[in-house]
């Protein structure tokens, strides 16, 4: 990594909505340890990400990275689609 490059946060998640134009909603899951009982619990966050060209479908597993604010709710952009969802007919 060069001096000029910044560390950029990137996350993996599942697309849960693609109804907006150039925007997808990605659910990112994380595991958190319960403070009292010590059991690991799944917690999720829904993030709005910029999808130039509307290439994602619901159920796709994608990688997103943080960027400058694009709109009021979008500060993440789509990097790549890791796995396509299977089409059920």
Swiss-Prot record:
It comes from the Bacteria. Gene3D superfamilies: Nucleic acid-binding proteins. It holds the Pfam family Ribosomal_S17. One of its GO terms (biological process) is translation. GO terms for molecular function: rRNA binding; structural constituent of ribosome. One of the primary rRNA binding proteins, it binds specifically to the 5'-end of 16S ribosomal RNA. Part of the 30S ribosomal subunit. NCBIfam families: PRK05610.1, uS17_bact. Belongs to the universal ribosomal protein uS17 family. This is Small ribosomal subunit protein uS17. It comes from Coxiella burnetii (strain Dugway 5J108-111). The gene is rpsQ.
């Amino acid at each position: 990594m060069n001096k000029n490059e910044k560390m950029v946060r990137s996350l993996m998640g599942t697309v849960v909505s693609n109804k907006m134009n150039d925007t997808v909603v990605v659910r990112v899951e994380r595991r958190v340890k319960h403070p009292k009982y010590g059991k690991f619990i799944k917690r999720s966050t829904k993030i709005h990400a910029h999808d130039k060209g509307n290439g994602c479908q619901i159920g796709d597993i994608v990688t997103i990275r943080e960027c400058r604010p694009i709109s009021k709710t979008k500060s993440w952009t789509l990097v790549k689609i890791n796995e396509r969802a299977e089409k059920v007919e």
